[in-house]
Amino acid sequence: MTAQIKDSGLQFHPRKREILICDFKGNIVPEIVKKRPVVVLRDPLPYRSDLAIVVPLSSTPPKYGVPYCVLLSQNYLSQDDKPMYAKCDLACSVSLKRLDRIKVGVRKYVCPRMNEDDFANVVRGVGWAFGFVA
């Protein structure tokens, strides 16, 4: 039985550096299989306006010090000091139907943007994970 993905999702393409929630339901372990925050890696590709390239974010520290797990300068989802990491080895394209803004209240949603320094580090981490950087 396959998992059902909601048929709504975003009605617009998110901008590079925006942080959203992605429902990874239907993936297979060791892939991400639940809702996770993600950062949008780039603006839409031509003829692919229904897809977004994202990098998952996590508050769980990596088991090993690897260059594709990037420690961010702040937690973009809360005001606490809990560290946040970009899991750059798990970058992927997802349907906009999997994405939603972050709910902060009754019918209130936000799309925070990652700062440029953190984003540059995430891009480097993705390059390392995909073998584009030595």
Language-model features and meaning:
Residues Q4, N75-A134:
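C-terminal terminal-subdomain/extension
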Residues I28-K35, V40-S78:
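Compact nucleic-acid interaction/catalytic patches
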Residues M1:
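Short, basic/aromatic beta-hairpin or loop at an interaction surface
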